[in-house]
């Protein structure tokens, strides 16, 4: 009896479904043309994808390259732009009550200094004038972002660059692009509705009954049906592990707005904190995607809409943001019997750090590494589930970090996020470690995306460590740090020299001509004076600031729920366009 799985059936489209299809059809059959595995994707023609997510992380270029996708064509088809990092504004306040700002960059100089982590030097001596954050002293991205530079030279080809980068993209167009690529490479596309799911005596999925095409036997099923989790949750009964005790937000407003001047397009995502959540701003080539992620415990939909539109001000006229309910958490097991959940059906962590496509990518790679035969050895599912659980937990912890280290006193939302939400033991232990030493990657149990530098950037920018006295700082010298900073600035100038304006680079990639972008300020090696440490203007909020200490975190939550009737309406969706916003 043939024990080999001959067909993989994906249920659901969107970014999750089509990225899975594109990955499987390429890597299962690229070296196996004589005995290819059939890939079928079934999606409903009646349930539209809710397109929200429009940003990625710096693993994305390698993913597209591995899929054999032309980067130039991707930019044109998806109205993509470059992303060099995320700017966080108003998540904390300084000692005068003013909003602070920092950038989480995509690269860093990680060499030691005098046998020690150079972050100790920054902690003890601070940065040079105009470089008040750690990212200004160990990464070039902030300078490039402030000067609105692209990461490539005009002469660079696909996937070549001087700086690490990710993309902003139109999620709907990206899913369409992946669909075309997948079908061209042999994916069988079925437009139909799944009406019934059959199970055998073991509880395995044996067949899908389609509305128009009838019964369809299956061997291995990939559930990409979004928040509904049609197969993994509703049929197989895998429980959902709710993260609401850790993270408050459960709603989002989304709207598209035009560029005021496309020539000034920023190569970064912006995350600006408001009274009950935060606003994302993702600049595509042809428009800006923006929205408000908030908590219904502190704002009704109407209140959030008013706050959001007031924040946007003159940029919006007669805008009607759509409301998107979001469910934060994960399935207890992403692999159950002969079904594997990928995308929203597996789980969704608040989209603050653009991690959804990254998770889809890693889930599919793990499937290929643990690909079963028809016996479905339990050890494979066990390994897959343990690894994906750890991956999602590490992302969850890093998202929580942004909230539990805030020092805002101007709203109940921010006080609750800091003082009453549960902090996982894994993050508690790490924060306690940071009170005594600055960890390195070996201290992180399974580094997936956010390593010690990411944690350092956030904790230093928020002032969480400013009162800590590190024993290791006895062994460092100011002269070493001053020399390193002088070398760093010279190296930064060299690396950024010749990099074009972001808009001009996008026009070059797309093969278009237009008026050159307007540059302002003095030029240093091809980029503006603003690149040298000048901080973007923050939101001035006259509020008191409190110092956050580890002892102030409380593992409980008590607040009154605030609802309106509109919040009871569910939005039907197969996917959330890759389930990422940032």
Predicted regions mapped to residue ranges:
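Predominantly flavin-linked oxidoreductase catalytic cores and closely associated redox partners
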Residues: 157-159, 163-277, 283-291, 295-304
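Glycine-rich FAD pyrophosphate-binding loop
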Residues: 27-52
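Long, low-complexity C-terminal extensions of enzymes
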Residues: 369-521
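Dinucleotide-binding Rossmann-like beta1-alpha1 core, especially the glycine-rich loop
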Residues: 48-144
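N-terminal Rossmann-like FAD-binding beta1-loop-alpha1 element of flavoenzymes
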Residues: 7-34
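Conserved FAD/dinucleotide-binding core of flavoprotein oxidoreductases
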Residues: 273-325, 345-358, 370-373
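FAD-binding beta-loop-beta segment adjacent to the flavin cofactor pocket
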Residues: 324-341
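Long, low-complexity, intrinsically disordered segments
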Residues: 532, 536-582
């Amino acid at each position: 009896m043939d024990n080999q799985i001959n067909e993989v059936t994906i249920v659901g489209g969107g970014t999750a479904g089509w990225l899975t299809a594109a990955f499987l059809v390429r890597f299962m059959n690229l070296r196996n043309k004589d005995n290819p595995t059939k890939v079928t994707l079934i999606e409903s023609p009646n349930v539209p994808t809710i397109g929200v997510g429009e940003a990625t992380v710096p693993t994305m270029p390698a993913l597209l390259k591995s899929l054999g996708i032309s980067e130039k064509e991707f930019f044109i088809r998806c109205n993509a732009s470059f992303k060099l990092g995320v700017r966080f504004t108003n998540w904390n306040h300084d000692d005068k009550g003013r909003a602070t700002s920092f950038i989480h960059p995509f690269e860093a100089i990680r060499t030691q200094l005098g046998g020690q982590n150079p972050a100790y030097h920054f902690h003890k001596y601070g940065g040079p004038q105009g470089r008040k954050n750690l990212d200004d002293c160990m990464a070039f991205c902030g300078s490039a972002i402030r000067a609105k530079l692209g990461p490539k030279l005009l002469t660079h080809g696909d996937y070549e660059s001087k700086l690490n980068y990710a993309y902003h993209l139109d999620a709907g167009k990206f899913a369409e692009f992946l669909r075309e690529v997948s079908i061209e490479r042999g994916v069988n596309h079925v437009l139909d509705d799944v009406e019934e799911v059959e199970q055998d005596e073991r509880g395995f999925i044996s067949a899908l009954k389609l509305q128009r095409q009838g019964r369809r036997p299956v061997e291995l099923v990939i559930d990409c049906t979004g928040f509904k989790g049609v197969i993994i949750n509703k049929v197989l009964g895998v429980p959902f592990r709710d993260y609401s005790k850790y993270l408050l937000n459960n709603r989002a407003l989304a709207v598209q707005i035009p560029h005021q001047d496309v020539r000034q397009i920023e190569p970064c995502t912006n995350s600006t904190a408001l009274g009950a959540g935060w606003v994302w701003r993702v600049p595509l080539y042809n428009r800006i995607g923006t929205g408000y992620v908030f908590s219904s415990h502190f704002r009704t939909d109407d209140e959030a809409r008013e706050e959001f539109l007031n924040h946007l001000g003159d940029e919006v006229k007669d805008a009607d943001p759509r409301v998107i309910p979001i469910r934060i958490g994960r399935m207890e097991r992403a692999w159950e019997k002969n079904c594997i959940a990928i995308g929203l059906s597996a789980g969704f962590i608040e989209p603050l750090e653009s991690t959804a496509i990254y998770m889809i990518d890693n889930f599919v790679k793990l499937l290929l590494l643990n690909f079963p035969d028809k016996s479905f050895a339990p050890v494979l599912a066990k390994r897959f589930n343990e690894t994906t659980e750890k991956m999602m937990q590490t992302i969850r912890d890093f998202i929580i970090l942004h909230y539990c280290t805030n020092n805002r006193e101007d709203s109940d939302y921010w006080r609750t996020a800091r003082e009453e939400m549960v902090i996982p033991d894994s993050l508690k232990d790490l924060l306690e470690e940071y009170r005594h030493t600055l960890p390195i990657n070996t201290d992180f149990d399974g580094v997936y995306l956010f390593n010690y530098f990411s944690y350092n950037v956030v904790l230093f920018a928020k002032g969480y460590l400013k009162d800590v006295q590190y024993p290791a700082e006895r062994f460092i010298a100011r002269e070493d740090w001053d020399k390193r900073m002088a070398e760093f600035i010279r190296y930064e100038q060299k690396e950024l020299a010749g990099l074009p304006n972001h808009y001009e680079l996008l026009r070059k990639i797309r093969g278009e001509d237009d008026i050159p972008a307007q540059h302002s300020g003095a030029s240093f090696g091809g980029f503006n004076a603003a690149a040298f440490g000048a901080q973007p203007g923050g939101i001035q909020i006259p509020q008191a600031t409190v110092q956050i200490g580890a002892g102030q975190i409380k593992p409980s939550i008590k607040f009154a729920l605030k609802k309106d009737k509109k919040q009871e309406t569910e939005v039907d969706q197969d996917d959330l366009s890759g389930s990422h916003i940032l």
